[in-house]
């Protein structure tokens, strides 16, 4: 037994300068785990609640002292003396104590920080790296893989102050033989993209996730400049590097009119019309994955999009599924999408996150492990991706330490595991095997 002797939390600062919750779990024998909760900008309406103080005199209302107080008070009291190795029990104690469907009493940011810190402490007590402990919790001990990165090198939407409506334009270095080589390829394309943008007189300031955030003539132009950068880096688009997009379409959906409004280029679409627009882009560019291609409530539209594109490319549900097994089950039962984006803080505990990954995989869906736009130096998602052999990860661009921390952790893990953690590249993407 790894008995919990102390649980504490504090308010720290995330990559956007906003407060977040960091927790520590201390065990007998001196083992300690520490973790911080991330925070999203474009959030699904059914996500677990991120508790903020609302005191405008502190951090413009974004303080997290209530969540910190929940950890230092009732959560700590309930967990003292409990066995950190029983992750499911630890998470269930916090969920039951909170007593709400969406963790609105303590905040998912409080519960998640403790959940992840507990897993880290338990791993330390067993003398295991975190990814190995996660594999055991997942019921797949010793089964690992290195994830194919989706690198968000042009930021738009809620992640940038520009006129590009689609939120993320990503590259996948599918021609790489290892994760380390994939990171190198991504960095080379990123630096060449800076040159391409400068040559066209575009801004090279970066957005929340470390990608460039220029004003462009259209969303398609984002794909065009990336194509130029891939070629300039000496790679073949479609062979060495493929493309992916996160539309975050809920952010430009007009629910009253049931229209998708790309204000940046002055175009308005019906639900099916927007899916047709996306299909047209996939015929012009080697796009192999599209996330949140419609509003989270547009299930009828998603059925059409899945039918139209689901055999050819990966259709990822983020706001659509919010890492929630109840909602994912509905999607699976109705043939909606073929992949789920996995974000710890959408659901609020490690146990529930692992359940969502398992449900997706059992149904033949892929699971893409993801960061949030508000991050810290905490690199737990790297260990989650390897420890569940999820196969894909989204953790931003090749700048900003909050993004690069995850890539660096993956490089370390790959070095430690060698052939035990294969890098399968494009085979991991739904519809591309």
UniProtKB/Swiss-Prot annotation:
Keyword annotations from UniProtKB, A to Z: Cytoplasm, Glycolysis, Lyase, Magnesium, Metal-binding, Secreted
One GO-annotated biological process of the protein: glycolytic process
Gene Ontology CC: cell surface; extracellular region; phosphopyruvate hydratase complex
Binding site for (2R)-2-phosphoglycerate: 167, 343, 372-373, 394
Keyword Heme recorded: no
Cofactor binding, note field: Binds a second Mg(2+) ion via substrate during catalysis.
EC number annotated for this UniProt entry: 4.2.1.11
Family annotation (CDD domains): enolase (cd03313)
Catalytic residues (positions): 209, 343
EC main group: lyase
Record keyword Endoplasmic reticulum present: no
Pathway: Carbohydrate degradation; glycolysis; pyruvate from D-glyceraldehyde 3-phosphate: step 4/5
Reactions it catalyzes: (2R)-2-phosphoglycerate = phosphoenolpyruvate + H2O
Residues binding Mg(2+), per UniProt: 246, 291, 318
Pfam families noted in UniProt: Enolase_C, Enolase_N
HAMAP family: Enolase
Family: Belongs to the enolase family.
Role played: Catalyzes the reversible conversion of 2-phosphoglycerate (2-PG) into phosphoenolpyruvate (PEP). It is essential for the degradation of carbohydrates via glycolysis.
Protein name: Enolase
Species of the source: Tolumonas auensis (strain DSM 9187 / NBRC 110442 / TA 4)
């Amino acid at each position: 037994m790894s008995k919990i002797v102390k649980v504490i939390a504090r308010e720290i600062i995330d990559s956007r300068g906003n407060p977040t919750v960091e927790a520590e779990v201390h065990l007998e024998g001196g083992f300690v785990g520490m973790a911080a909760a991330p925070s999203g900008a474009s959030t699904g309406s059914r996500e677990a609640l991120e508790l903020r103080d609302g005191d405008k005199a502190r951090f413009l209302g974004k303080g997290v002292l209530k969540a910190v107080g929940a950890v230092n008070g009732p959560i700590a009291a309930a967990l003292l003396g409990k066995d950190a190795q029983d992750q499911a029990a630890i998470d269930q104690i916090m969920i039951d104590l909170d007593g709400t469907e969406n963790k609105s009493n303590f905040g998912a940011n409080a519960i998640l920080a403790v959940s992840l810190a507990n897993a880290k402490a338990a791993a330390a007590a067993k003398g295991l790296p975190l990814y190995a402990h996660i594999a055991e919790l997942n019921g797949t001990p010793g089964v690992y893989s290195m994830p194919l990165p989706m690198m968000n090198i042009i930021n738009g939407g809620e992640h940038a102050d520009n006129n590009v409506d689609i939120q993320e334009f990503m590259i996948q270095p599918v021609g790489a033989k290892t994760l380390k080589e994939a990171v190198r390829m991504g960095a080379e394309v990123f630096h060449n993209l800076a040159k391409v943008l400068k040559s066209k007189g575009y801004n090279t300031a970066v957005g929340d996730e470390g990608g460039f955030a220029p004003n462009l003539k259209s969303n398609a132009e984002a794909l065009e400049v990336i194509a130029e950068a891939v070629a300039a880096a000496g790679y073949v688009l479609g062979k060495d590097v493929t493309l992916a997009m996160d539309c975050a379409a809920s952010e430009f959906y007009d629910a009253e009119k049931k229209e998708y409004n790309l204000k940046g280029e002055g175009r308005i679409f019906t639900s099916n019309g927007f899916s047709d627009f996306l299909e047209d882009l996939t015929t012009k560019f080697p796009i192999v994955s599209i996330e949140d291609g419609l509003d989270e409530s547009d299930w009828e539209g998603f059925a059409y999009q899945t039918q139209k594109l689901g055999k050819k490319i990966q259709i990822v549900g983020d706001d659509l599924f919010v890492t929630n097994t109840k909602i994912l089950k509905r999607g699976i039962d109705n043939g909606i999408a073929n992949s789920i984006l996995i974000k710890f803080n959408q659901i609020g505990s490690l146990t529930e996150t692992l359940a969502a990954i398992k449900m997706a995989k059992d149904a033949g869906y892929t699971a893409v492990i993801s960061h949030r736009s508000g991050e810290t130096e905490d690199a737990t998602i790297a260990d989650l991706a390897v420890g569940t052999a999820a196969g894909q990860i989204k953790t931003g661009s090749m700048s900003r330490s909050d993004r690069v921390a995850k890539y660096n952790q993956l490089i370390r893990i790959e070095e430690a595991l060698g052939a035990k953690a294969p890098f399968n590249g494009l085979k991991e993407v739904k519809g591309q095997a």
